[in-house]
Curated annotation (Swiss-Prot):
GO cellular component: plasma membrane
EC number per UniProt: 2.5.1.141
Broad class of the protein's primary localization: membrane
Protein name: Protoheme IX farnesyltransferase 2
MF-aspect GO terms: protoheme IX farnesyltransferase activity
Subcellular location(s) of the protein: Cell inner membrane
């Protein structure tokens, strides 16, 4: 009896771990930081804790839903990749229908929280990001187009905008800058992953840039996107949304990241190692900027491009 109970307990723990894994906790955590950064930038020190908690929890559940459903969609290509071949949607440890229902439930709960506590614009951006990620990127673009990363970058840039618009209820220049900034950041971040996971993507026949058009072109794009990202990031302080601390941090991190990327042109470069370094510093960069803009906000007069409130 005790042996059976222990076995059941072990199976339950494994099942629980599987459900957690399909939500991709690392992605959720990264998005939490950017949502908080966008929210606190817009709040400018006047923080509504209930609204902030609702924005963080609601958006996290939406992201978790998208990731769970993405696992269902990607099960065939995940089976061909060393990094993902042991996911529960591939092994069958959890039935696919259960993961799908779990993802739908998370989405309903997440969107429900955003609808109840935030505003129509924040909810709209969350919905658009979700549709782009699940419906356009996962179902079609990732498998069929070299531009899949570009399309996916939009959904990856939505979380800080949701946080920002939860406070303002309007689409102003600050929100536009955040959307551009985080979209641009996604590109070198994703291309770096595609380089050090090249064999996986090639085996699954996913047409990411390094696989479809070669390493040389991917390196050019990484450098170009980092350079443009650096310029766009300075728009937050130049437009008066943040102060000198943010300007200093964005200049320092962007310059270091760009210098690191340029090392990819060396003849003796170890490509996988270099790509991992570019990827790793991309996380440091965006985390540093999210934290800094949350602390170094400025009280500026916001001119809305359009307003959509409850």
């Amino acid at each position: 009896m005790n042996t059976q109970a222990r076995l059941t307990s072990t199976q339950w723990k494994a099942r629980f771990k599987g459900y957690v894994q399909v939500t991709k906790p690392g992605i959720i955590f990264g998005n939490l930081i950017s949502v908080a950064g966008g929210f606190l930038l817009a709040a400018k020190g006047d923080v509504d804790l209930v609204l902030m908690l609702a924005s963080l929890v609601g958006l996290s559940l939406v992201v978790a839903s998208g990731c769970a459903i993405n696992n269902c969609i990607d099960r065939d290509i995940d089976a061909k990749m060393q990094r993902t071949c042991k996911r529960v949607t591939v092994t069958g440890e959890i039935p696919l229908s259960h993961v799908l229902l779990f993802g739908i439930a998370l989405g309903v709960l997440g969107f429900g929280i955003l609808a109840l506590f935030t505003n129509a614009l924040a909810l709209l951006f969350a919905a658009i990001g979700y549709v782009v990620y699940v419906g356009i990127y996962s179902l079609y673009m990732k498998r069929n187009s070299v531009y899949g990363t570009l399309v996916g970058s939009f959904s990856g840039a939505v979380p800080p905008v949701v946080g920002y618009c939860s406070v303002t209820g309007q689409m102003d220049m600050g929100a536009v800058i955040l959307l551009l900034m985080f979209s641009l950041w996604q590109m070198p971040h994703s291309y770096a992953i595609a380089i050090f996971r090249f064999n996986d993507y090639a085996a699954a026949k996913i047409p990411v840039l390094p696989v479809a058009e070669g390493m040389a072109k991917a390196k050019h794009h990484i450098v170009l996107y980092i350079a443009v990202f650096a310029l766009v990031s300075t728009m937050l302080p130049l437009a008066g949304y943040t102060g000198t601390a943010f300007m200093a941090v964005t200049c320092a991190t962007s310059l270091w990241w760009l210098t690191m990327a340029l090392k990819g042109y060396r003849q003796d470069v170890d490509m996988p190692r270099w790509a991992r370094q570019v990827f790793g510093f991309s996380i440091i960069t965006i985390t540093a900027l999210s934290v800094t803009m949350a602390l170094d906000f400025q009280a500026v007069s916001q001119t809305p491009l359009f307003t959509l409130v409850r």
